[in-house]
Swiss-Prot record:
Any one GO BP annotation for this protein: lipoprotein metabolic process
Family matches, as PANTHER family: APOLIPOPROTEIN C-I, APOLIPOPROTEIN C-I, ACIDIC FORM
Miscellaneous: Apolipoprotein C-I is present in acidic (APOC1A) and basic (APOC1B) forms in P.paniscus, P.abelii and P.troglodytes and perhaps also in baboons and macaques. The two genes for ApoC-I arose through a duplication process that occurred after the divergence of New World monkeys from the human lineage. In human, the acidic form has become a pseudogene sometime between the divergence of bonobos and chimpanzees from the human lineage and the appearance of the Denisovans. Pseudogenization resulted when the codon for the penultimate amino acid in the signal sequence was changed to a stop codon.
Originating species: Pan troglodytes
Pfam families per the UniProt record, alphabetical: ApoC-I
Main location: secreted
Any one Gene Ontology molecular-function term assigned to this protein's record: fatty acid binding
Protein name in the entry: Apolipoprotein C-I, acidic form
Similarity comment text for this entry: Belongs to the apolipoprotein C1 family.
Span of the signal peptide: 1-26
Gene Ontology CC entries for this record: high-density lipoprotein particle; very-low-density lipoprotein particle
């Protein structure tokens, strides 16, 4: 009885699998499969360049360097006094 029911189900499943993708699921016109990846890379490159330019043109790196230098100098002086 089980075999009698499972064979038609198996035939239907195999026919669906072998039929291939539906037209809506078919791949769009594929001129180059890496076009999307290339576009993503260019966008990422542009955003990274813009971010680096913003950082180099801002005063933040200079202020941070001054703060670290001053803090290091203070710690160094404290260690000299305590030793």
């Amino acid at each position: 009885m089980r075999l009698f029911l499972s064979l038609p189900v198996l035939v239907v499943v195999l026919s669906m699998v072998l039929e291939g993708p539906a037209p809506a699921q078919g791949a769009p016109e594929v001129s180059n499969p890496f076009d999307g990846l290339e576009e993503l890379g260019k966008t990422l490159e542009d955003n990274t360049r813009e971010f680096i330019n913003r950082i180099t043109q801002s005063e933040l790196p200079a202020k941070m360097w001054d703060w670290f230098s001053e803090t290091f100098r203070k710690v160094k002086e404290k260690l000299k006094i305590d030793s």
